[in-house]
Amino acid sequence: MPWRIEDLNQVLDGLGRLAELLTPSPIDAPALSLPGGRHWSRLHDAPGSVDALDWLDPWVRHNLERLAAQEADFDQAAAGSTLVHTDIRADNVLLTGEGAVFVDWPHAAVGAAWIDLLYFLPSVAMQGGPEPNETFWAHPVSTIADSDAMLAVLAGITGFFVHCATLPAPPGLPTLRRFQAGQGQHAVAWLRRLMA
């Protein structure tokens, strides 16, 4: 499903409104942390798991140590006071005449206001939308994002996508790992560009 620009703009506008409305967080929620810990470190410690990923840019295999070091600052970099969804993607958004509605919040946490935008953009690129870097920095919510913090968070979530793509599919979600692999490919390309 390629993104139509008007639909994408509706979601991007909604993400801006969401950040405004949910800062500070209106509920007590846990601080954002990387689900499952440090994924590049896991892949670094078990390099065979990366070698099996024929879809993965070879740059990753040559830079696992750098990627693991980059994700180490995730918790500090992701800190903030905004209630964030952490799983914005096309199937968690309803487009209405009054704007985007974000559904399915089981992983809500408190973090930086720009987290949802960053997490969302690899799936947009995967589904025929624009490349993420320009879209991220053109969005108003990115004005409060420090580039080093953004890079640490991008490294962390990219490691999550890539590592999860190597795992068996959970019951009832047979396409999840393929989706995460697609997110991972586009996130790796974004990360590689920023780490060049």
List each model region and its residues.
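Active-site activation/catalytic loop segments of kinase-like enzymes and analogous catalytic loops
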Residues: 114-144, 154-172
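Hydrophobic multi-pass inner-membrane translocation pores used for secretion
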Residues: 77, 89, 120, 145-148
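A cross-family kinase active-site recognition segment
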Residues: 1-61, 79-81, 109
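Hydrophobic/aromatic-rich alpha-helical bundle segments in the mid-to-C-terminal region
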Residues: 29-30, 168-181
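Active-site acidic catalytic loop and adjacent metal/ATP-binding pocket
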Residues: 69-115
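Regulatory N- and C-terminal appendages and interdomain linkers associated
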Residues: 182-196
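Short proline/glycine- and basic residue-enriched helix-capping loop/turn segments at helix->loop/beta transitions
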Residues: 62-70
